[in-house]
Amino acid sequence: GILSLFTGGIKALGKTLFKMAGKAGAEHLACKATNQC
């Protein structure tokens, strides 16, 4: 029903945000490691 659609959307959004944050974090660590921030 509506609720399962809603929770599915929340989960998908969370996954996307987590991926984006992970990518940004990795890039930040890489620039820190090479002193290019």
Swiss-Prot record:
Locations listed in the record: Secreted
Disulfide cross-links: C31-C37
The organism of origin for this protein: Rana luteiventris (Columbia spotted frog)
Tissue: Expressed by the skin glands.
Family: Belongs to the frog skin active peptide (FSAP) family. Esculentin subfamily.
Keyword rRNA-binding included in the entry's annotation: no
Swiss-Prot/TrEMBL keywords: Amphibian defense peptide, Antibiotic, Antimicrobial, Disulfide bond, Fungicide, Secreted
UniProt record, GO biological process: defense response to bacterium; defense response to fungus; killing of cells of another organism
Single GO cellular component term: extracellular region
Role played: Antibacterial activity against Gram-positive bacterium S.aureus and Gram-negative bacterium E.coli. Has activity against C.albicans.
Record's protein name: Esculentin-2L
Domain of life: Eukaryota
